[in-house]
């Protein structure tokens, strides 16, 4: 009989069915560029830059911005931010620029234009009679791009968090080398009138392009990145969390994965490390693949690698990290099992370290140390195995390594120890938990066991 089927009786009649559930219909798309063409968008007719500035500033003062006009202006303003390419710049086989070339953000992408005119109407506020300076253009570009960052701030952030961010951004763009062009709180007022800037594809594309440029090229106006930095590794929270995790526990990626004792990690690890991507290449298009429209559904997001994401943040919770306690649990990816493994891995790496002497007063002291260490190794290798010291180590929790951790889990029947539960409760109960966060999950799951 088919191993996928189950059998049962209905009204004394034997029934055999194959249980099938809804599967994810969306395919993860990897961002590798295979046609050797730069990312591109199409915008309306290029405007007169000064006329566009006056129109956009007028619209910002009136909290009425036309997204198409904003995008057209941001693309046209790229010519103002010329810099020098520090090294040969290539990504996915595409030559972006040579070392020493004069480049602008527009060099990184292909911006196509149609003959369709923008609105460019003065919609309110004071009309500017003179032409704006480069500093004023830079301020307007910075403020507009900051709408992207504000629209990405989650509603879970309490209090005046978003308002405080907007105020700090305004302060940046009213001091040198920028120039003050709007009154206080204008940015936040404009954001409230249209809070979904991060969902506008062309605006997101331009924000990512500016960020990619200013992250590589030293420039007087690099602070514009304050509004665009969130486009870097966007929808990569799974991969970013894994990168932070291995740095936190001081292991290589290969060494860390050896601790992932669950079958559901297999597909996610394969997905995260798909060959042909530029995950480790500095200044690659990969870093901004989401904003540049190179992937519809990211294979590196927390939802795409939910088991990995859950495990990493349960370990982070065990270690008392605020970021992990505040992160959102991926409820469809075995959070109970991941919390068990997270407890054991937290115990493995929390409050312990691997230390050795690396610096010496002179060469003789170094040689003496190496000789002594070599003797210790020889003695260890000569163990006649009459005493199985490993058993005691497994129970005491002193032996380090994936084999030892796995053995401890098996000896405890795949359940958390009381010490793990006490630690989880200790870190989560003293934290003001957000809805659906890891802190809330730990409180609800283990508080009755404390």
Curated annotation (Swiss-Prot):
- Cite a single GO MF annotation: RNA binding
Gene Ontology, cellular component aspect: helical viral capsid; host cell cytoplasm; ribonucleoprotein complex; viral nucleocapsid
Instruction: List the InterPro entries.
Output: Rhabdo_ncapsid (IPR000448), Rhabdovirus_ncapsid_C (IPR023331), Rhabdovirus_ncapsid_N (IPR023330), Rhabdovirus_nucleoprotein-like (IPR035961)
The Phosphoserine modification is found at 389
Matching entries from Pfam families are given as: Rhabdo_ncap
Keyword terms, alphabetized: Capsid protein, Helical capsid protein, Host cytoplasm, Phosphoprotein, Ribonucleoprotein, RNA-binding, Superantigen, Viral nucleoprotein, Virion
Task: Tell me where on the tree of life, at the top rank, the source sits.
Answer: Viruses
> Where, per UniProt, does this protein localize?
Virion; Host cytoplasm
Q: What is its main location?
A: virion
The record's account of how the chain is modified after translation? Phosphorylated by host CK2. Unphosphorylated protein N seems to have a better affinity for leader viral promoter encapsidation. Phosphorylation of protein N in ribonucleocapsid may stabilize the interaction with protein P, thereby playing an important role in viral transcription/replication.
Role according to the record? Encapsidates the genome in a ratio of one protein N per nine ribonucleotides, protecting it from nucleases. If expressed without protein P it binds non-specifically RNA and therefore can bind it's own mRNA. Interaction with protein P abolishes any non-specific RNA binding, and prevents phosphorylation. The soluble N-P complex encapsidates specifically the genomic RNA, with protein N protecting the genome like a pearl necklace. The encapsidated genomic RNA is termed the nucleocapsid (NC) and serves as template for viral transcription and replication.
What family does the entry list?
Answer: Belongs to the lyssavirus nucleocapsid protein family.
Q: State how it assembles.
A: Homomultimerizes to form the nucleocapsid. Binds to viral genomic RNA. In nucleocapsid, binds protein P and thereby positions the polymerase on the template. Protein P acts as a chaperone on free protein N to prevent it from aggregation before encapsidating genomic RNA.
What additional remark is attached to this entry?
A: Displays a superantigen activity in human and mouse, activating mostly V-beta-8 subtypes of T-cell receptor.
State the protein's name.
Answer: Nucleoprotein
Whose protein is this, by species? Australian bat lyssavirus (isolate Human/AUS/1998) (ABLV)
From the broadest rank down, the organism's phylogenetic lineage runs: Viruses, Riboviria, Orthornavirae, Negarnaviricota, Haploviricotina
